[in-house]
């Protein structure tokens, strides 16, 4: 299939398997959940009754005081007591093999292309890293203001000019992930990045 560039009359040939694949929502959901789970730090730690310091002595005798029975001042029922089901450091990583991951990316790119949220441009260039210049470039092409820009390699002027905008993310091809692709309203890809994506996923 061919994709039309927005800012020129040129077209580029791309693989059907990458930009015209079937939409597989269960697979995309699984891969996105796994990606976000893998990004979790997993270092939370709490102490159980056994790990909290103190509490070795029975606070008062079992009978005769009129008070409720108590065996430790570190009971989970007490203030400063231990946690009943204490959280411990753990890994949240979910296994997703390479074929599934790439298939999910192809499905996302294909759906974005079908519904008009995928935009290919010949090139995106700024002569200076100014937010005003970047906004003018986006307005000239009517791209909107909720954007993911994908470049073939790090474009320092585009990155610096856009980093003050809360709904704009600029990445290179190596940083592509399913969560980012779905987060933004439109995905803008330059020609060099599009060729690299096509080669990578086809």
UniProtKB/Swiss-Prot annotation:
GO molecular function: rRNA binding; structural constituent of ribosome
Family annotation (SUPFAM superfamilies): Ribosomal protein L4
Keyword Disulfide bond in annotation: no
Keyword field: Ribonucleoprotein, Ribosomal protein, RNA-binding, rRNA-binding
Any one GO cellular component localisation term in the record: ribosome
Annotated segments matching region Disordered: 47-67
Pfam families, per the entry: Ribosomal_L4
GO biological process: translation
Domain of life of the native organism: Bacteria
Quaternary structure, from the entry: Part of the 50S ribosomal subunit.
Similarity field: Belongs to the universal ribosomal protein uL4 family.
Role according to the record: One of the primary rRNA binding proteins, this protein initially binds near the 5'-end of the 23S rRNA. It is important during the early stages of 50S assembly. It makes multiple contacts with different domains of the 23S rRNA in the assembled 50S subunit and ribosome.
Protein name per Swiss-Prot or TrEMBL: Large ribosomal subunit protein uL4
Species annotation: Dichelobacter nodosus (strain VCS1703A)
Species classification: Bacteria, Pseudomonadati, Pseudomonadota, Gammaproteobacteria, Cardiobacteriales
